[in-house]
Amino acid sequence: EDFASDEQEQSKLYWTDERVTGGEDPIELGSNNSGRSVGGSTVHFTMVSLRFRPEWFRSRSLLGYGVDWPVSAQEMWRYYEEAEQMLQIAGPVNYPWGPPRGRYPKREHPMNGAAQILARGCERMGIQWATTPLATLSSPHGEAHPCVYRGFCGVGCSTNAKQSALVTWIPKAIAHGAEIRDLAMVGRIETKHGEATGVHYHREGQWRFQRAKHVVAAGYSIETPRLLLNSANGEFPSGLANGNGLVGRYLMVHSNHAVWGEVEEEVRWYKSPPSIAITEHWNYTDEGKDFHGGYCFMSQGPLPMLWAQTVATARGMWGMELRREMTKYNHMVGLKIVGEVEPQARNRVEVADEEDQYGLPIPRVSFAYSKNDKRLYEHSLESMRQVLEAAGSRNLWTQDGTAHLMGGCRMGSEPEQSVTNADGRTWEIPNLWVCDGSLMPTGGGVNPSLTIQALACRIGDRITEMGKRGEL
């Protein structure tokens, strides 16, 4: 009952606290990449659940760009499967990209009108497409009902069909003894003699302290670096785990540019999850590219308020002109990319002089695209235009955008080049760990949520194994 079918009301799920954003290409922060609820951003994500292309885990060695991960594709494949089983991913019998794999736990979702446009355009262009693997139920699971295709996925699922962390990992953790302290803000990690001793957090109007033998930071790519930097003290004057100055650096997003158009037939693109059909053609094809990396693109289905905001912002429409444009809503179609962005040291999270309501310095985010990122962007726009035109779309226009967050506390094999090791254990403080998307050394050309959850499964196993061996 906390998830109303009301776009404006559900903006409470987004992290909209003040943040300073700048650089050559400032990124938007909030609903497109940050959540503030039990379950985090998975409560409002659109459930796209894709594995990395295996070569991306060794992109420097095999593809000539980026940096190699400290974990292998072979090891991650096992944890991808574990995450897919927990989330009951619904996908096609034969997903056409990547190594051979077993079937998804649930059957694929039916195609809506927007997905049929992508499929039609891709087929006419000779490009392979598939239904998108999604973390929402296509058949009953336990007490949860399957998706009823209301289209409110991005503002919280009121039926529990969406398999967010709120209804999967968290209940399991609570059943095994975890305690959730919601409506709390962690401000600082305390250290003594080179080790973390606990966290200071604000709850119910006052600051409190929780002692801990181990601290795991999982605030995502802005709040985790912010927490480590705000925890600077006499022992660690530049921030925790930041002796090499890399905390907050190598922040990444995904290009999330769109091409929109209209068609004669009635599409009603809001019926169903937003991204029902996908092509990863340009993730797995390296020929004919003038850029490193890759991208996928998916069909779209924005709700009315979001669509009105999109049109008003991207096209400058207002008043009667906007009202007339909105009458075309059921005939609109669109494609959006998830495009890889190179890791750059200049893209970073720092702390600003301004403070929030808790007296904590707020984050300052700087971002700029590389020349390679811009070439990928131009290539993807042309590809999407061609597919929509092949499907019979007209009056095409484009929209800039970014989505997702990755990096900021990158994992690696060498202490000089990373914040943590392959297990998320910080090099400088042995009982301080990071377990979120900030660990990712590269972003790939797919949504990061499945990779983040697979990494968390792996880190959990490693902590358990080390504990059993007495190494903690």
Regions of interest found by a model, annotated:
Residues 18-33, 41, 45, 69-73, ...:
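FAD cofactor-binding and catalytic pocket of flavoenzymes
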